[in-house]
Amino acid sequence: MQVVVPFAATEPKTRLADVLTPAERTAFARAMLADVLTAVVEAGHEPTVLATAPLDLETLDLEAAVRDAGSVAVDDRPLTEAVNARLPERGDGGDDGTHIDPVAVVMADLALATADALEALFSAAADVAVVPGRGAGTNALVVDHPEFRVDYHGASYLDHREIAHDVGATLETVDSFRLGTDIDEPADLVEVLVHGTETDRAPARLREFGFELERTDGRVTVARLEESRPK
């Protein structure tokens, strides 16, 4: 199985602009990417970062084994086109024209991803397995059908269900809190601090920036220490 991790190498995570500077967003995005790559390798696979611009894995905080297992492919096309170019076609996996090698697509902002969560996705038996995100997006999927293609515009999870039906592919929805939580908005940062582990890079980066959990009216939010705020 090929595992592709799309990554916006320039100007990442713009929806976090209200709480992070451009440099901080870049550092945080790369920390999340490093955590995702680590989880993929721990799940027994070799990830390919599908980056919008050149990216040196040496610049990421990665263990040597993870760095050596990974690779980078540069494709500056929109996400849908770039991913579709990586999906299997009939005959990709064998000479008889029938077998194909499945392709998994795992987004780089799944900061809570673990090897166990990924293994549950990778082991799904359907032609197409999808982990929906909040708001009907698609956070991760595995494609084992030569005619299925992605469409990441709008409510992509609903679109992917329809596309699978149209091409005659079986589909399984994989219910996963860890893979279903993508980090896009300031409110999402609380999930990183609550559920991240001590060895994860993303929560460590947020703490370096001065973020901490704050309890107000029975709810947990994040707050940034005043002295750590950019001037």
From Swiss-Prot:
Pathway: Cofactor biosynthesis; coenzyme F420 biosynthesis
Reaction equations catalysed: (2S)-2-phospholactate + GTP + H(+) = (2S)-lactyl-2-diphospho-5'-guanosine + diphosphate
A Pfam entry, by short name: CofC
Coiled coil stretches, renumbered: none
Gene Ontology biological-process entries: F420-0 metabolic process
Domain of life: Archaea
Annotated EC: 2.7.7.68
Keywords assigned by UniProt, alphabetized: GTP-binding, Nucleotide-binding, Nucleotidyltransferase, Transferase
GO molecular function: GTP binding; phospholactate guanylyltransferase activity
Membrane-spanning ranges: none
Role according to the record: Guanylyltransferase that catalyzes the activation of (2S)-2-phospholactate (2-PL) as (2S)-lactyl-2-diphospho-5'-guanosine, via the condensation of 2-PL with GTP. It is involved in the biosynthesis of coenzyme F420, a hydride carrier cofactor.
UniProt similarity note: Belongs to the CofC family.
Complexes and interactors: Homodimer.
Entry protein name: 2-phospho-L-lactate guanylyltransferase
Organism name: Haloterrigena turkmenica (strain ATCC 51198 / DSM 5511 / JCM 9101 / NCIMB 13204 / VKM B-1734 / 4k) (Halococcus turkmenicus)
Gene (name only): cofC
